């Protein structure tokens, strides 16, 4: 077996964290031959819950789990890590405006960005799951910039990507394995653009483009997009809790593919720092289609847009620029 990977999960006492840690520990994310040292971080008030999660992981008797430790301070959490799942964030409460939510999260992700710079390896790879994920990733990357390159920071839009795959499979009466290359553009929010223009569906051994497979353009430009955009809210309405199982699976898919690479001819959606591709402002954490090889993602180039797609992408870009500006103002206001 190879040397253990040290993997941090923040917010590990919460629902999503609880669902993520088992997938990391049992080899789903990094493979059955790769031992992991799991570090679970949460606030001191959750130390008892964290200890219970540690006990459960020990009781799973997993060959790939080299060690597991629960911590409540950033130095212990971030020291020497290879991967970070930043799940913990301030949730939006009733009556809270976006700027208030951003201000609360700026403090958390500024602190974690600085901790990454001070204690983590320069090769550490980071996925931000806690919302607003794109902007939280932007802030963490900003404060870790002296040590960890921006390309090592990402935010999760794989949940939206997986939701889009599932809806397309349901509509065409096939299975997930027969659908590929959906794209989530932009923010992990209600403005995201789930795009199937370049997606394909394999039915009865024949691969066809998604629009032809569905045969209903109005559906793909209306209800399909709305279903993916609003899915999280619908699940809260039904369960009275936010998506946890599906969010954890998506975070693990995201890191699995970053670690092992994407399959030939397939791309996935990741929110990563823009390099100016498709006219998206440089540095904005924006969901793009990417391919991954050797642990490095690349934005898929040369895709074309119609006016409908351009309008959707412009709307999500505008929202992300506003979020970024509000977050930077919160940094200034808090003198951080």
From Swiss-Prot:
InterPro entries in the record: L-lactate/malate_DH (IPR001557), Lactate/malate_DH_C (IPR022383), Lactate/malate_DH_N (IPR001236), Lactate_DH/Glyco_Ohase_4_C (IPR015955), Malate_DH_AS (IPR001252), Malate_DH_NAD-dep_euk (IPR011274), Malate_DH_type2 (IPR010945), NAD(P)-bd_dom_sf (IPR036291)
CDD domains: MDH_cytoplasmic_cytosolic
Membrane-spanning parts: none
Annotated positions binding NAD(+): 11-17, 42, 105, 112, 129-131
UniProt GO molecular function: L-malate dehydrogenase (NAD+) activity
GO cellular component, one term: cytosol
Catalytic activity, EC: 1.1.1.37
Major location (coarse): cytoplasm
Catalytic activity: (S)-malate + NAD(+) = oxaloacetate + NADH + H(+)
Cellular localisation: Cytoplasm
Top-level taxonomic group: Eukaryota
Keyword match Plastid: no
Any single Pfam family the record assigns to this protein: Ldh_1_N
Temperature dependence: Optimum temperature is 40 degrees Celsius.
Gene Ontology biological process: malate metabolic process; NADH metabolic process; oxaloacetate metabolic process; tricarboxylic acid cycle
Record Gene3D superfamilies: Lactate dehydrogenase/glycoside hydrolase, family 4, C-terminal (3.90.110.10), NAD(P)-binding Rossmann-like Domain (3.40.50.720)
Coiled coil region boundaries: none
Protein's job: Catalyzes the reversible conversion of (S)-malate to oxaloacetate in the cytoplasm where oxaloacetate is used for gluconeogenesis.
NCBIfam families: MalateDH-SF1 (TIGR01759), MDH_euk_cyt (TIGR01758), PRK05442.1 (NF003916)
HAMAP family (UniProt xref): Malate_dehydrog_2 (MF_01517)
Subunit structure as annotated in this protein's UniProt entry: Homodimer.
The protein's name: Malate dehydrogenase, cytoplasmic
Origin species: Caenorhabditis elegans
Higher taxonomy: Eukaryota, Metazoa, Ecdysozoa, Nematoda, Chromadorea
């Amino acid at each position: 077996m190879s040397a253990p990977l040290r993997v941090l999960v923040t917010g590990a006492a919460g629902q999503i964290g609880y669902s993520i840690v088992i997938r990391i520990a049992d080899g789903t994310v990094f493979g059955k031959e790769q031992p992991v040292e799991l570090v679970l971080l949460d606030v001191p008030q959750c130390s008892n819950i964290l200890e219970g999660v540690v006990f459960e992981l020990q009781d799973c008797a997993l060959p790939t789990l080299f060690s597991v430790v629960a911590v409540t301070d950033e130095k212990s959490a971030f020291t020497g890590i290879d991967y970070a799942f930043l799940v913990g964030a301030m949730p939006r409460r009733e009556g809270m405006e976006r700027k208030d939510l951003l201000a609360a999260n700026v403090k958390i992700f500024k602190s974690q960005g600085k901790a990454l710079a001070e204690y983590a390896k320069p090769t550490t790879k980071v996925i931000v799951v806690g919302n607003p994920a794109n902007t939280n990733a932007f802030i963490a990357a900003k404060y870790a910039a002296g040590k960890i390159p921006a390309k090592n920071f990402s935010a999760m839009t794989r949940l939206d990507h997986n939701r889009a795959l599932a809806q397309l499979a349901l509509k065409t009466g096939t299975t997930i394995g027969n659908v590929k290359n959906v794209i989530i553009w932009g923010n992990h929010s209600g403005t995201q653009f789930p795009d199937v223009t370049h997606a394909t569906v394999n039915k009865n051994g024949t691969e066809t483009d998604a629009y032809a497979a569905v045969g209903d353009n109005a559906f793909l430009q209306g209800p399909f997009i709305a279903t993916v955009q609003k899915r999280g809210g619908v699940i809260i309405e039904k369960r009275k809790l936010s998506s946890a199982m599906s969010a954890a699976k998506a975070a693990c898919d995201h890191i699995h593919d970053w670690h092992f690479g994407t399959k030939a001819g397939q791309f996935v959606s990741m929110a990563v720092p823009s390099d100016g591709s498709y006219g998206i402002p440089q540095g904005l954490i924006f969901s793009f289609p990417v391919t991954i090889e050797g642990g490095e993602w690349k934005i898929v180039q040369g895709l074309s847009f119609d006016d409908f797609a351009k309008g959707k992408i412009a709307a999500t870009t505008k929202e992300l620029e506003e979020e970024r500006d509000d977050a930077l103002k919160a940094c200034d206001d808090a003198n951080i």
